[in-house]
């Protein structure tokens, strides 16, 4: 079972839901993996005081020029769709932060003057405690293409585990990379026009990708039905409501998960998981 | 020597467009022949790294000096490799900036004056 957690809008509580969901499943017979794929700002590790067992660097290939072979034909410049190579006088200028590692330049260079060389783009850290594993991805400072690091985190997915993937906000490539191939996506939102606006974008993205989803309303207030009306209209299940409460925010701000600060949430998260299992089975 | 000014129009009476990679035109003046003409900045149509595409365009038009407002790190690196000198102004008509350049009143950029714009 692979469950992704997305939101559209940032700061709605994806990590709050992901961490408590993972902790509520500790008694399940299957091991639990929490993948922190919010690689630009990974923070799930703050809630689990675990020692990192290992870390692996993530590399992407970028072109390197051998001037003894280069004939200054400009084929590589013509091929590059990202302007990552410029031919200026007798210099081939390569811009690593613009390169998307497509490989077009070194495949099509007529003299094999361009060769792929590894560029570090991030790291993947693994922490383990009993049957629980936390895998965190970190994008290297100055790098701005996150999907390769997200994919490196997801390469650690264990098919026999319950895999929970905490993703970044938005609805573009990084989020598509975290929801891709998952059995279900939990969308965490808040009852504000901003929460709704970005929720709509995320739902539309999931529909294109054909991934089933349901909604968790965080910071819920009884008199506000802005999200309820949308979900009813779209036939989306509301899986859980987390009320707007100072106590929840206060504990969370100290790095304490919801289920640890208030254990009566544990059965609710377990029910959330069982609901997702039922939704997937349908 | 060819001097190009990033502009919003095609003549010396048009305003400077301070965005190097996204300006509409470059008004080019040839110091020796005194000729003036404009080229469209096709680099601005790039989805990303417009500054690099723009620098390549200026290089292809054998420009020696570019006058603009803002130059980012990638564009600066590309212009440096092309041996194109960068002078920065803030605002005014193309003719005013050319005048300031000739009088030595524009500062030569020794590095990018804005951060990366993303790509």
What are the roles of these predicted feature ranges?
Chain B
Residues 69:
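Conserved residues at the C-terminal ends of beta-strands
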């Amino acid at each position: 079972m692979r469950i992704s957690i997305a939101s559209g809008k940032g700061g709605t509580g994806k990590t709050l839901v992901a961490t408590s969901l993972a902790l509520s499943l500790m008694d399940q017979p299957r091991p639990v993996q929490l993948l922190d794929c919010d690689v630009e700002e990974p923070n799930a590790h703050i809630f689990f005081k675990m020692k990192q067992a290992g870390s692996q660097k993530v590399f992407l290939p970028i072109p390197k020029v051998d001037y003894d072979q280069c004939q200054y034909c400009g084929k590589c410049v013509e091929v590059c769709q990202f302007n990552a190579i410029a031919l200026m006088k007798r210099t081939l200028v390569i811009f690593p932060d613009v390169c998307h590692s497509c490989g077009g330049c070194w495949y099509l260079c007529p003299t094999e003057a361009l060769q792929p060389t590894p560029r570090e783009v991030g790291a993947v850290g693994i922490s383990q405690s009993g049957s629980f594993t936390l895998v965190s991805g970190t994008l290297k400072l100055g790098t701005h293409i996150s999907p390769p690091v997200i994919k490196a985190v997801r390469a650690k997915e264990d098919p026999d585990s319950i895999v929970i993937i905490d993703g970044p906000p938005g609805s573009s490539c990084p989020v598509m990379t975290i929801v891709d191939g998952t059995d279900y996506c939990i969308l965490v939102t808040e009852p504000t026009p901003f929460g709704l606006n970005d929720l709509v974008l995320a739902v539309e993205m999931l529909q294109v990708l054909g991934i089933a989803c349901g909604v968790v309303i965080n910071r819920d207030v009884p008199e506000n039905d802005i999200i309820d009306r949308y979900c009813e209209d779209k036939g989306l299940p509301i899986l859980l409501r987390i009320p707007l409460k100072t106590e929840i925010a206060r504990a969370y701000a100290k790095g304490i998960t919801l289920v640890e600060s208030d254990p009566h949430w544990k059965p609710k998260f377990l029910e959330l998981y069982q609901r997702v299992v039922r939704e997937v089975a349908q | 020597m060819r001097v190009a000014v990033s502009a919003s129009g095609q003549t010396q009476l048009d305003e400077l467009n301070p965005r190097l990679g996204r300006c509409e035109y470059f008004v080019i003046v040839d110091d020796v022949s005194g000729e003036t003409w404009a080229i469209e900045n096709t680099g601005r149509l790039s989805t990303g790294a417009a500054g690099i595409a723009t620098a390549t365009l200026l290089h292809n038009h054998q420009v020696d000096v570019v006058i603009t407002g803002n130059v980012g790190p990638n564009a600066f690196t590309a212009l440096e490799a092309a041996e194109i000198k960068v002078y920065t102004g803030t605002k005014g008509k193309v003719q005013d900036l050319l005048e300031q350049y000739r009088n030595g009143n524009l500062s030569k950029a020794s590095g990018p004056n804005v951060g990366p714009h993303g790509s």
